[in-house]
Amino acid sequence: DHGQIDIRQVFHLNACLVDMGFIRLGANGLPEEYEAYSFSAGFSTHIHLKDKGDERLVSRVHKALLALQAAYPQCIDRVYTAEEALKEEGLSGEFSFVVEGALGTLFQNSFTAPILISRESPLYDQYSATHGHHPSKGEKPPFVAFGPDIRPGVVIDGADLLDECPTLAALAGVDMPQMEGKPFPILK
């Protein structure tokens, strides 16, 4: 599996989008209308647009996200377009942008919380660590295997997480031809 990183601070990107006019809240503090919203994936967050075909909206939101990155460099490492996320990271989905947090910055979905809450703040109410970060960050947990179907003494310096499931399926004798990835070169 993948590791976890300690949370240093929580960033509420939806609160920024409210302040920028991309989300309008009702009297109950919940969205009544939106043009863009953030949906947290932990240390990264996906930005969804009401109308992905509206080029003007796409441009406005992209500029706003880059402005937030410039204003909060301690919180935001990278803003990916959907095309960049697919090309560079193999990440696809219904989102228009992906925002990658700086090391230790957790994204949450609140619309009304303070934009930034440090771990030392009395307002901090999150767990201590989580995942959802870029693969270049954090510890790299080992994959350890042994048994009658495993070649002894094999060490792989690095591997793709997508290759874990095909490895386990091969060990179980399950044929899954449509699966992404390939078994680790550890099988007899």
Where are these regions (language model features)?
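Composition- and surface-driven signal marking solvent-exposed, interaction-prone regions
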Residues: 112-114, 157-158, 180-182
